[in-house]
Amino acid sequence: KVLYETGCFDDVYEITGEVSQKIRDSLEFPQTGPIGCNKFDSDEKIYYVDLNAAYMRFVQYIPTGIPNEDGEFPGRNYTVGKVIQQLYDIRKASNPKLAMTLKLLMNSTWGYSIKKPQEMKSKHYEKVDNFVERFSPFVLKYEFTQGQSGLVTTLKPIVEHWSYPQFAKAVLDNYNEFFSEVKSKVKVYYENIDALMTNEEGYNKLIEMGMVGEKMGQFKLDKIFTEVHVLSKRKYWGVKEDGEIVKHCMK
C-alpha cells in the first residue's frame, strides 16, 4: 500500500498469459557456491563482504506500460528507487521492530511479483463423499477429519493469475549487471547471493572503486579469514583472525 500511494506503481500493469510466463522463464536468479569449481580451500587472508540492504540496492525502477509479445516494456517508473532509499534510511535510524516491518514490506512486494499460478486449492467440506462424487474429475486427494467432513484438494478448472513479473526482471537484471562488473574487476572465490569472498587485493580494489562503506549498495566487511574451506554450495568453514572457527551451513 505504501508503494502504491507514493506512485511507485503508476502506469504499471499486472499481466498474465504467455508474456508473463516468458518473463518468469527469463529470470536469472543469484547463484551460490565457489566460482569455477566444486570446492575451494585457502590459507591466505580471505575477506568475506556482504552488500548493505541486499537486493534492495537493485530496486531502481519498475517497467511501465503494456508489453509487446517479447515481454518488452515501453517505459520505466523510477519512483520506487527513491522510496526504497527513503525506507532504507528510516530503517537504519529506527527501532528494530519498525526496521523488521519495513523489511517484510519490501520482501512481500518482491515475492508477489514472481508468484507462480496456483493451480490447486484445498477446502473443507461437510460431506466429502458427495463432493468427490460430483466433482471427481477435478479431485486430486481428500481426507476425512471428522465424520463425513474433511479436506479436499482439487485442480482448478480455471486459473486466474495476475502479477507484475517485470518488477522482478528489472531487479534481477540490475543485480546480474552489478555482480558481473564486480567479478570482472575483482577476484571472487565464492559468492552467496549478496555476499562474496575475495583476497586482500580484491578487497582493496573494492575500496578504490568506492564500493565499501555504510551506504545502501556498498559492501561491508563481515569477516576476515586466515583459513577457509568451502565444501559445497551451501557449506563452508573458516578460521578468523582471532582464532574463532566459523561454520556455515545454509538451510
Report the location of each language-model feature.
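Conserved acidic
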Residues: 1-251
